[in-house]
Curated annotation (Swiss-Prot):
Record protein name field: ATP synthase subunit delta
GO CC, any one term: plasma membrane
Primary localisation category: membrane
Pfam families per UniProt: OSCP (PF00213)
Keywords, sorted A to Z: ATP synthesis, Cell membrane, CF(1), Hydrogen ion transport, Ion transport, Membrane, Transport
NCBIfam families associated with the record: ATP_synt_delta (TIGR01145), PRK05758.2-2 (NF004402)
Length: 177
């Protein structure tokens, strides 16, 4: 776990607890997306470098997001600003999504394949994983041309490497004793 993930964990946990308490998980997801989108904008990054006071930085975020930012979100923005933590917003968001998945009894699966898979193939993989893990499955799919052939499936800390490259490596290892 990276330092950013370690720092992001309590922020995400606190946000998620507020979201559960107020039944506002989707709203908080949108708020986090909004904040991280603004913070990652190239023109806005200059403000995040410390050239502006935390008070005014918070005010800018709050003013831009008047329509979606409630009192709890204002407090989060102020806290992120005071602690100069806008750089870990992606980590906070990812952790929040994982907490939501756990809460809803969903596993998040990262699927990488050498070539583009059709939607029906991805759905078949999803069904197999749901039967295997006995949970709903959300697949995050990416094409990775670095994979020789086949696919790599990552669930939590478990990796199923079904690539040709891995099979060749295993064969090579077994022949070399």
């Amino acid at each position: 776990m990276s330092v950013a993930d370690t720092i992001a964990r309590p922020y995400a946990q606190a946000i998620f607890e507020i979201a559960i308490e107020n039944n506002t998980i989707e709203k908080w997801k949108n708020i986090l997306i909004f904040i991280k989108t603004i913070a990652s904008h190239k023109k806005f990054k200059n403000f995040l470098s410390g050239s502006i006071s935390p008070k005014y930085l918070s005010l800018i975020f709050i003013t831009i997001g008047t329509n979606i930012i409630d009192e709890n979100a204002k407090n989060l923005i102020k806290l992120l600003s005071e602690n100069q933590r806008f750089n870990i917003l992606n980590n906070i968001f990812e952790r929040f999504v994982k907490l939501e998945a756990c809460y809803k009894n969903i596993i998040i699966v990262q699927l990488k394949s050498a070539f583009s898979l059709k939607e029906n193939h991805i759905n078949k993989i999803r069904k197999v994983l749901e039967r295997f893990f006995l949970k709903k499955t959300k697949i995050i799919y990416k094409v990775d041309p670095n994979i020789l052939n086949g696919m790599i499936v990552k669930v939590n800390n478990t990796i199923f490497d079904l690539s040709a490259q891995n099979h060749l490596k295993q064969l090579s290892d077994s022949l070399n004793f």
